[in-house]
Amino acid sequence: MDNPMLLKSTTRHVRIFAGEIDRDGDLVPSQQVLTLDIDPDNEFNWNEDALQKVYRKFDELVEASSGADLTDYNLRRVGSDLEHYLRSLLQLGEISYNLSARVTNYSMGVPQVAIDDKQVS
């Protein structure tokens, strides 16, 4: 295959490309390497632990689909599952919205505010 097509999955917070970055910074299609871009618009505040959880989940999802053909559909399924995982991290408070982001649109739901029952009359 002289000019392979670049397969990709793009959601609001997850971009997966079937390819790798070369020395010139160009994305080169590949059937062997997946490149993951998490939260490209910096909508969330991240810590290293949360990022590592996402990378481990990504590896787990890719491993679970090993043996299947690398298709747009299969790649989008991994991306969609990873997007749902990010939502769960947000709901658990492991990541939070970045209020200094270019756009604050609460795409995964309005932030929850804890209410102290003792102060409610």
Curated annotation (Swiss-Prot):
Keywords: Membrane, NAD, NADP, Plastoquinone, Quinone, Thylakoid, Translocase, Transport. GO terms for cellular component: plasma membrane-derived thylakoid membrane. InterPro entries: NdhM. Its EC number is 7.1.1.-. It is a peripheral membrane protein. NDH-1 shuttles electrons from an unknown electron donor, via FMN and iron-sulfur (Fe-S) centers, to quinones in the respiratory and/or the photosynthetic chain. The immediate electron acceptor for the enzyme in this species is believed to be plastoquinone. Couples the redox reaction to proton translocation, and thus conserves the redox energy in a proton gradient. Cyanobacterial NDH-1 also plays a role in inorganic carbon-concentration. This is NAD(P)H-quinone oxidoreductase subunit M. It comes from Nostoc punctiforme (strain ATCC 29133 / PCC 73102). The lineage of its organism: Bacteria, Bacillati, Cyanobacteriota, Cyanophyceae, Nostocales.
